[in-house]
């Protein structure tokens, strides 16, 4: 029994060490070690990106051929970039795309405003209304997409704006926003299905989706 517990603790310690090394180095050989250790601990952790933005090439590949896609984002700029363009075309479209973005409407208990204040502490060009404006632009973009093709649902939420989740039926990209950096500069975890991290990412999304509000569509011009 003691040997079993020591083995489990050893695996967890090794996983933690490899995770730190992966964050420090971000090299592909290190990813293989992280993935091997994750199979022992059943976390499903496959890769660690130093910055969320450096994951976009792999994310684009995983989005191609996905049966469904779930996105929970703090701003949603990635939805308008090239990485997501295959989802908006009829040829490569998945069966279902669910998108959650923050509620940009004025309210006393706005978590979006809390994140704006947080970012403004390290980015002097980030005004209180800038994030709200950017979210509105991305909501408008996706709302128009929902009218142009089937299978896309858009909702808004007012919950702690502290992570981004992009998940498919095969994997999930999970970013925890730092209080001292933009999301694009925060580390991103790649979790394969099945696994503890993948399940946690889906639970995070589903909980937010259940308490979200359907976004009003913007009429096409």
Give the predicted meaning of each segment:
Residues 152-190:
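HKD (HxKxxxxD) catalytic microenvironment of the phospholipase D
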Residues 26-117, 206-207, 211-214:
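PLD-like (HKD) phosphodiesterase/transphosphatidyltransferase domain
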Residues 112-162:
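HKD-type phospholipase D/PLD-like phosphodiesterase module
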Residues 1-33:
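Hydrophobic, helix-forming membrane-interacting segments
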């Amino acid at each position: 029994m003691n040997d079993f517990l020591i083995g489990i603790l050893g695996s967890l310690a090794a996983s933690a060490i490899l995770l730190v090394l992966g964050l420090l180095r971000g090299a592909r050989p290190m990813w293989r070690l992280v993935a091997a250790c994750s199979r022992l601990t059943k976390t499903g952790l496959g890769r660690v990106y130093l910055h969320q933005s450096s994951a976009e090439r792999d994310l684009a590949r995983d989005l191609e051929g996905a049966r469904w896609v779930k996105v929970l984002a703090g701003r949603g700029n990635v939805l308008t970039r090239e990485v997501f363009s295959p989802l908006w075309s009829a040829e490569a479209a998945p069966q279902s795309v669910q998108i959650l973005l923050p509620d940009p409407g004025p309210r006393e208990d706005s978590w979006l405003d809390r994140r704006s204040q947080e970012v403004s502490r390290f980015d002097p060009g980030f005004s209180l209304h800038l994030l709200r404006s950017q979210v509105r632009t991305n909501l408008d973009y996706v709302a128009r997409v929902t009218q142009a093709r089937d299978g896309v649902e858009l909702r808004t939420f007012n919950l702690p704006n502290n992570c981004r989740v992009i998940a498919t039926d095969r994997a999930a990209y999970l970013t925890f926003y730092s209080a001292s950096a933009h999301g694009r500069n925060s580390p991103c975890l790649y979790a394969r299905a099945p696994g503890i991290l993948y399940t946690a990412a889906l639970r995070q999304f589903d909980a937010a989706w259940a308490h979200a509000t359907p976004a009003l569509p913007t009429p096409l011009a």
